[in-house]
Amino acid sequence: MADGSGWQPPRPCESYRAEWKLCRSARHFVHHYYVHGERPACEQWQRDLASCRDWEERRSAEAQQSLCESERARVRAARKHILVWAPRQSPPPDWHLPLPQEKDE
């Protein structure tokens, strides 16, 4: 990976620019603030865009390493969320019975 001969960035540079632009939009700001209670952090997208452009222009090893680490961190962050509900292997035994509110009527 250090030689960079056949390596390509994980995403096209346009993708990093689009993500950065979306992150800075008013709509995303309002949504993120409503959901998380804090401002969205867009600096990483900007750093990734700069690294991608640096890679395209100079084939910089530092830019390559930065992009790889950033994408790995994104994958780890996406995988760390656990399921809220445990998946069922089979339906409950009484699934066909009427619901309690239907019994009262």
Curated annotation (Swiss-Prot):
PANTHER family cross-referenced by the UniProt entry: UPF0545 PROTEIN C22ORF39
Family according to the record: Belongs to the UPF0545 family.
Protein's name according to its UniProt entry: Synaptic plasticity regulator PANTS
Subunit structure: Interacts with RTN4 isoform A/Nogo-A; the interaction results in enhanced RTN4-mediated inhibition of AMPA receptor clustering. Also interacts with NCAM1, RANBP2 and CCT8.
Pfam families referenced in this protein's UniProt entry, alphabetically: PANTS-like
The keyword Secreted is assigned to this record: yes
Function of the protein: Negatively regulates long-term potentiation and modulates adult synaptic plasticity. Stabilizes the interaction of RTN4 isoform A/Nogo-A with its receptors, inhibiting clustering of postsynaptic AMPA receptors at synaptic sites. Upon neuronal stimulation, degraded at synapses, reducing RTN4 signaling and allowing AMPA receptor clustering at individual synapses.
Biological-process GO terms, alphabetical: negative regulation of long-term synaptic potentiation; regulation of synaptic plasticity
InterPro entries: Pants/Emi1-like (IPR021475)
Subcellular location: Synapse; Synaptic cleft
UniProt keyword list: Secreted, Synapse
Any one cellular-component term (Gene Ontology): synapse
Post-translational modification: Rapidly degraded by proteolysis following neuronal stimulation, resulting in increased AMPA receptor clustering.
